[in-house]
Swiss-Prot record:
Residues 1-116 are annotated as: Disordered. It holds the Pfam family Chitin_synth_1N. It comes from Rhizopus oligosporus. This is Chitin synthase 2. The keyword DNA-binding does not apply.
């Protein structure tokens, strides 16, 4: 018999044996010995082996003589090609090719049934809840270093039948409080249908970070047993949506077993399946298994929550924050999207920021675009442009906002929050309350502004943290922490992603500016509140600038290309690249192409999905890039000619050169902008994107303004996440149940009229009904149709306001008959260029201050 062990954490028994035996299913009392003495071990399925470990040697005792189909052999597997080892050295057993068989079939092998023999047991409910302690496979346990302790020998399954907010009050608990452990880091990995490679990339990266925490033996918090203070929570959005190969990786980690979960418990439908286990293995993206004790792998406490239904990412965060958070009571919560790979020490650096400054409520690291092996992904101009965009945001934008203390968005792909700061007040009002409003007000009965705003609910959470009543929390950027993620490499995916980003950020930005007074109800110092006001002014200017970006970009193109011809005011360059008539012809042709492209964007955005218009959108981006090349040529030529003219007329005096509008507006403003890009990149010791991605970003910048903005604004009515559907079954027509008749065939019972008088009565009723005169009914729209009409009418009004305001700006500047001011085109071009330069100076100043503060605060 098995030796007597410690008492279980609760009055519970395993759901079933892990041994395969010839014993028939029997009913057992919970007070009988669950493991009979005469039942031998016969589970010889090997665990995936690691290159660092030789294959496990399994016992060679023969199977029971009455085991069905058991051959009289002494080895678990017959030798193949005179190789007695069941697996090839250094190669995981699951990936070794099987010996050829005369009965070989081709194609994908069918999925193995989870159990061939099951034992039915009586299981006591724990406080009315189904909780099962299931032994892990013996093959797994034989291949790991730690074999004692229930967290290593048993996987704990809980069938949750409650809403996340009722998890603790309904009597559910988790292993950490039962083991008396204090959790310092609670890491959540949100998942939908990502494949096994993306999941392993993230999970293996997290486990490498946990291993790094265990190497910090001089820390007061961490050390060799630091893994006991970290819990990794994996939340998968929908049981029918999860990738099956990802489930196989989870099963390999020991945290998932097939055939355990149940749909209904005591008449209540299960809302989430919760699996808990402390794994001792890790699977890297190459599907190689690393065991505890090897490099970068230590035990890891995993909490796997498999939601029964697909209910969006924000609902996954409800399970993390509302259900599991209060039970575990962590210090810091880290949010990571599956597919994002954290750097080897990134989680430690995030945690250290909270440890140094007790006023930090949230922090984020750098989000990097995956460039592939030796940067091969940057050969795709779409990836390169996004790489440049991400880099400059992390070098200029995030440091500036961190200096102010308010970061407009902590990216959900890789960020961290202090659990204490997230909590609501005694009345239930606070950051989490506003954050989770997005689940009920997104779509549903929400107004269109709120629905779009909650497309970027993480921005709402950031503002609510900073403006929390009677608190003084700030947000911080940690440049030494980073997470790598895949970016869209196809035009249709890129446009669809940016639609939600642009609409969510626009409406969330309006929300933050509209509620600027909330900051004055916080407990921040007067200086900090004034800094927030300065940041609000900066954000307001950016918001207005982005609203008129469509008109501003066209005006810049119009004025610069017109200057190579006869000019907006009729003047010509002193040294043009070609004759004024040729320049005027080129300007006219390119101008018409620009206008046609804009019209095409509106037509496609209002009626086509990007997935159905890939060629059209790709072609549009190519044409806009060609227009950008001509515009840059015009800008460079005007700059060179302007410098020569100014030097000749001013005698080389810099003061006199500054008095020339051409020199000021074009040369100084543009050079200042791009020089600051280079200088700031070198200051952060990360300049390579300026050489590998800058040109691609410049060429695609017209598409950012014209393609992405138009598609986003024209689809503000679309606030769906694509996860809702009709999952109910109508029963108004009756339910047909099949039964076997006397001959053993299936038959059904249905109710149909058979009496002649009933049939005739129905016929007469139909005749009478047609003789009646009815009043014409007024058509009524149902609630869903009314909401869709309201959303579309809002979209129409918004797009009209956007088009009219930008068109009015273009007409006022480009048409001399509307406003006849001498040199107005040059004046407005100077305003645009100096605005860009001024915003760049502010960002550069903030970036420099961030580096200075980092020297003293770490």
């Amino acid at each position: 018999m098995y030796p007597e062990g410690p008492k279980p954490e609760h009055d519970q028994f395993p759901l079933q044996d892990t041994q395969f035996s010839n014993q028939p299913p029997v009913h057992r009392s919970p007070f009988e010995d669950p493991y009979p003495e005469d039942q031998p071990h016969f589970d010889k399925q090997p665990l995936l082996t690691s290159p660092a470990y030789p294959p496990t040697q399994y016992p060679t005792s023969p199977p029971p003589p009455n085991f069905p189909g058991s051959p009289a052999v002494q080895q678990p597997y017959p030798p193949f090609n005179n190789n007695p080892s069941p697996v090839s050295p250094g190669v995981p057993a699951y990936f070794n090719p099987a010996p050829p068989s005369p009965n070989m079939h081709y194609g994908q092998a069918p999925r193995r049934q989870p159990r061939r023999f099951k034992t039915t047991r009586q299981v006591k409910l724990t406080k009315g809840n189904l909780v099962l302690d299931c032994p892990v496979p013996t093959a797994y346990l034989n291949d790991v270093p730690i074999k004692d302790g229930k967290e290593f020998t048993h996987m704990r399954y809980t069938a949750a039948t409650c809403d996340p907010k009722d998890f603790a009050s309904d009597g559910y608990t988790l292993r950490q409080p039962m083991l008396g452990r204090k959790t310092e880091l609670f890491i959540v990995l949100t998942m939908y249908n990502e494949d096994e490679v993306l999941f392993a990339r993230t999970m293996h990266g997290v486990m490498k970070n946990i291993a790094h925490l265990c190497t910090r033996d001089r820390s007061r918090t961490w050390g060799p047993n630091g893994w006991e203070k970290v819990v990794v929570c994996i939340v998968s959005d929908g049981r029918n949506k999860i990738n099956q190969r990802t489930l196989s990786v989870l099963a390999l980690l020991g945290v998932y077993q097939d055939g355990i979960a149940k749909n209904v418990v005591h008449g209540k439908p299960v809302t989430a399946h919760i699996y808990e286990y402390t794994t001792q293995v890790s699977v890297d993206p190459n599907m190689e298994v690393k065991k505890a004790g090897s490099k970068n792998v230590v035990p890891c406490q995993i909490l796997f929550c498999l939601k029964e239904k697909n209910q969006k990412k924000i609902n996954s965060h409800r399970w993390f924050f509302q259900a599991f958070g209060p039970v575990i009571d962590p210090h810091i919560c880290v949010l990571i999207d599956v597919g994002t790979k954290p750097g080897g020490t990134s989680i430690y650096h995030l945690w250290k920021a909270f440890d140094i400054n007790s006023n930090i409520a949230g922090a984020c690291g750098e989000i990097r675009a995956m460039a592939g092996t030796r940067g091969v992904a940057l050969l795709n101009p779409l990836v390169a442009a996004q790489n440049f965009e991400y880099k400059m945001s992390n070098i200029l934008d995030k440091p500036l906002e961190s200096v102010f203390g308010y970061i407009s968005v902590l990216p959900g792909a890789f960020s961290a929050y202090r659990f204490k700061a997230l909590q609501n007040d005694v009345n239930g009002h606070g950051p989490l309350e506003k954050y989770f409003l997005g689940e009920t007000q997104h779509g549903g009965d929400a107004d269109i502004f709120t629905a779009n705003m909650y497309l970027a609910e993480d921005r709402i959470l950031c503002y609510e943290l900073v403006a929390k009543k009677e608190a003084h929390w700030v947000l911080h950027y940690v440049s030494s922490s980073y997470g790598e993620t895949d970016v869209p490499d196809k035009v249709d995916e890129f446009i669809s992603q940016r639609r939600r980003w642009l609409n969510g950020s626009f409406f969330a930005g309006v929300y933050a500016l509209y509620h600027w007074r909330k900051v004055w109800q916080s407990d921040h110092s007067y200086l900090r509140k004034m800094m927030f006001m300065v940041e609000d002014i900066y954000n307001t200017y950016n918001l207005i600038f982005s609203w008129f970006a469509l008109g501003n970009f066209y005006l810049t193109f119009f004025i610069l290309t017109k200057a190579l011809g006869h000019g907006v005011d009729g003047s010509t360059l002193t040294d043009p690249p070609f004759s004024p008539d040729t320049g005027e012809t080129l300007h006219t042709v390119f101008n018409y192409i620009y206008i046609v492209l804009i019209v095409i964007q509106f037509i496609m955005a209002l009626g086509n999905r990007p997935q159905g218009s890939k060629i059209a959108y790709t072609s549009s981006m190519v044409f806009f890039a060609i227009l950008m090349v001509y515009m840059m040529f015009a800008a460079i030529w005007i700059t060179v000619v302007g410098v020569k003219t100014v030097v000749e007329t001013s005698g080389g005096q810099f003061i006199e050169m500054l008095e020339q509008s051409t020199f000021r507006n074009i040369i100084i403003s543009l050079c200042a902008t791009y020089v600051m890009y280079f200088v700031s990149s070198f200051m952060f010791l990360d300049p390579w994107h300026m050489f590998t991605s800058f040109i691609q970003y410049i060429l695609l910048s017209p598409s950012y303004t014209n393609v992405l903005n138009i598609y986003a604004f024209c689809n503000t009515h679309d606030v769906s996440w694509g996860t809702k559907g009709d999952n109910t079954v109508a029963t108004d027509l009756g339910v047909v149940k099949a039964k076997k008749d006397g001959s053993g065939d299936l038959a059904v019972e249905v109710e149909v009229p058979v009496e002649e008088k009933d049939i005739n009565a129905a016929f007469i009723d139909a005749q009478v009904e047609l003789t009646k005169k009815i009043e014409p009914e007024k058509s009524h729209r149902d609630a869903k149709t009314k909401q869709e009409d309201y959303y579309r009418s809002f979209r129409t009004r918004l797009v009209l306001a956007w088009i009219i305001s930008n068109l009015a700006l273009v007409v006022a500047i480009a048409n001399t008959t509307v406003i006849d001011i001498k040199g107005k085109a040059s004046i407005y071009l100077g305003f645009i260029l100096w605005s860009v330069a001024g915003l760049s100076v502010i960002r550069f100043t903030g970036s420099t201050l961030y580096l200075i503060f980092k020297i003293f605060t770490g």
